Amino acid sequence: MNRRESVEFVNMCMIKNGDKVLVQDRVNPDWPGITFPGGHVERGESFVDAVIREVKEETGLTISKPQLCGIKNWYDDKDYRYVVLFYKTEHFTGELQSSDEGKVWWEDFENLSHLKLATDDMSDMLRVFLEENLSEFFYYKDGDDWLYDLK
């Protein structure tokens, strides 16, 4: 039995600054709305180096000590696995600047639920970022419906 599968790795990083968190209002028409910065892991790149690079490209900040705190994953209709690595950190240097990916700013953490978020499941994604007893957000198909479990 062949256990290899096609996988695409991406990352997302929650950067905290006191009671505020860095958000990005993405302009990509395929995935618009407010989320955390992040992006694709390039071939040959370590996961940690990828999240540091993506945050720098999208925000102007250089993060350090990113902690892997969970994953989100699913299979698409072609049986291709998509894995989002969730990181968080409070360690950064540099000056905040927006990029072509979207505008970035510090937002009160408690205000996140009132913003136009990029995904309807962002509140449950936040649970994986924050709750130590959760580490996985897994989407699966049940007939024509997409469901998910938090584990």
Language-model region placement:
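Conserved N-terminal beta-strand and adjoining loop/helix that marks the start
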Residues: 1-21, 37
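A short coil-to-beta-strand element that immediately follows conserved catalytic motifs
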Residues: 62-70
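NUDIX/MutT-family hydrolases
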Residues: 88, 97-130, 149-150
